Curated annotation (Swiss-Prot):
Substrate binds at D19, D99. Its EC number is 3.1.3.74. It comes from the Eukaryota. Mg(2+) binds at D8, D10, D179. It catalyses: pyridoxal 5'-phosphate + H2O = pyridoxal + phosphate. The keyword Membrane does not apply. This is Pyridoxal phosphate phosphatase PHOSPHO2. One of its GO terms (molecular function) is phosphatase activity. It is an enzyme of class 3 (hydrolase).
């Protein structure tokens, strides 16, 4: 029986937001005001589609975007964590559920040779079209009013766990490692033995702290981390038996 590790990507695996990082490829490293102002809450993926079109129209090519994305720094201790997981892969399944896109995540994992760590990546599908423009689509449609229109991470997590159960894979625990507001919804799926691991000082940690103070029911335990090394320590504790 294995433990399921669920990772967010932006500000969790990498120490920045890949979507805002790519703006450095724009002329003068900024977007025009009318494009910036076109964002509507809950519709980030559509907004990024317009950003990618703007970059393409300005002549920004795939190799330039790839160079920018692969220069994104890993969060402190994350490389050590992935090496630890690789050595203990018989004890863990790992998935990514991210609001980024498949092209950016592929580039980062490939450049660092970490593809083998992850059994599945759930994110907004992206590809370069015949004009050389990066296009991105919503991962799915859902009815959750807590999450952005393109992705409810809780729905994805439930579907993955159910599918694994149908194939005879039952996890002893789920450990959810994230940072953002859109990680709150999947954390509410966690049960008794599961662990929510919010990054210290980020929205997820602040929200879980507020929920705890309000005495909202939380079956799972909460372990805060600042570095991947903190996560290693807790995983070592979980597998020591």
């Amino acid at each position: 029986m294995k433990i399921l590790l669920v990772f967010d990507f932006d500000n969790t695996i990498i120490d920045d937001n890949s979507d805002t990082w790519i703006v450095q490829c724009a002329p003068n490293k900024k977007l025009p005001i009318e494009l910036r102002d076109s964002y509507r809450k809950g519709f980030w993926t559509e907004f990024m589609g317009r950003v990618f079109k703007y970059l393409g129209d300005k002549g920004v090519r795939e190799h330039e975007m790839k160079r920018a994305v692969t220069s994104l720094p890993f969060t402190p201790g994350m490389v050590e964590l992935f090496n630890f997981i690789r050595k203990n892969k018989d004890k863990f399944d790992c998935i990514i559920i991210s609001d980024s896109n498949s092209v950016f995540i592929d580039w980062v994992l490939e450049a660092a040779s970490f593809h083998d760590i992850f059994d599945k990546v759930f994110t907004n599908p992206a590809a370069f079209n015949s004009n050389g423009h990066l296009t991105v689509e919503n991962y799915h449609t859902h009815s959750c009013n807590r999450c952005p229109k393109n992705l409810c991470k809780k729905v994805v997590l439930i579907e993955f766990v159910d599918k694994q159960l149908q194939q005879g894979v039952n996890y002893t625990q789920i450990v959810y490692i994230g940072d953002g507001g859109n990680d709150v919804c999947p954390v509410t799926f966690l049960k008794n033995d599961d662990v929510a691991m919010p990054r210290k000082g980020y929205t997820l940690q602040k929200t879980l702290s507020r929920m705890s103070q309000n005495l909202e029911p939380m079956e799972y335990s909460v372990v805060v981390w600042s570095s991947g090394v903190d996560i290693i320590s807790h995983l070592q504790f979980l597998i020591k038996d």
